[in-house]
Amino acid sequence: PTWKRVFSARVFRDSKRFQTSYEDRVVKVLREYSDMPDKDVMTNEQILKAYGIISYTQTLECKGTVLCRTDTGQTFDTGDFPYGAVLNSQTMEHAKPVNIAKIRRIMTIENKANYENMSYKEDTLYIYCHGFFSPKEVEFLRELTVLAAENVEFLHWGDMDYGGIRIFLFNKDKIFPGLKPYKMDCESFVAAVTLNAGRTLEAEKRKKLEQMNAGELEELRSSILEYGMEIEQEMLV
């Protein structure tokens, strides 16, 4: 992988030229011809990341007690930061989780406001999802599945829309096989619509929802189509 600004400096002799003048056009082409199943809901950064161009903003945010060890043998505990720990890409590259003995629940949360609203609990690990996890994040987080005791609960709380369903399915398939949806059922959806927290479903998203296999979230998919509405987590804060 190459840092975005290093790539730009090497190609254009200007570290910001790629981002300001070419990034959107390059991503448009990559998105159009890519065979990645989630390309339509991936951000520019995620598309570029898949092709080896990375930015400095690749970080993993979490709240909870995870003991990690670097490849030089040093250890650190994310539990020392009860208001949230932030691991940059190089930390994820050179460290991995080695102990989560206190954790009984692991929850990925799609949106920042909802993540920030969750208070530290010694037996719970909250992970800010931000969308689709990068390959580096996926590799790092998979270690949690290996370390987790049999009674650890894996949950995902995300938007009740096309993208939210895709993110849940991605996390379940790529990271946490035992993942279950949290507050993403039909009852939660109807309650949110009743509170006027929904927004109108776009025609293009309706087509995609009609064609998708939503797995465990089939009832949610059907409800979105029935009501013609979708819900973002932030509307429920």
Describe these PLM feature segments.
Residues 1-128, 133-147, 163, 170, ...:
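Nucleic-acid enzyme cleavage-core boundary/entry regions
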Residues 106, 125, 153-155, 180-181:
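A structural signal for isolated positions on well-ordered beta-strands in alpha/beta enzyme cores
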Residues 129, 157, 182-184:
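Generic beta-sheet signal
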Residues 146-149, 175:
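Short, conserved loop/helix-junction motifs that constitute active-site signature segments
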Residues 151-161:
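Acidic beta-strand-to-loop metal/phosphate-binding motif
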Residues 177-191:
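Conserved beta-strand -> loop -> alpha-helix junction used to position metal-binding or nucleic-acid-contacting
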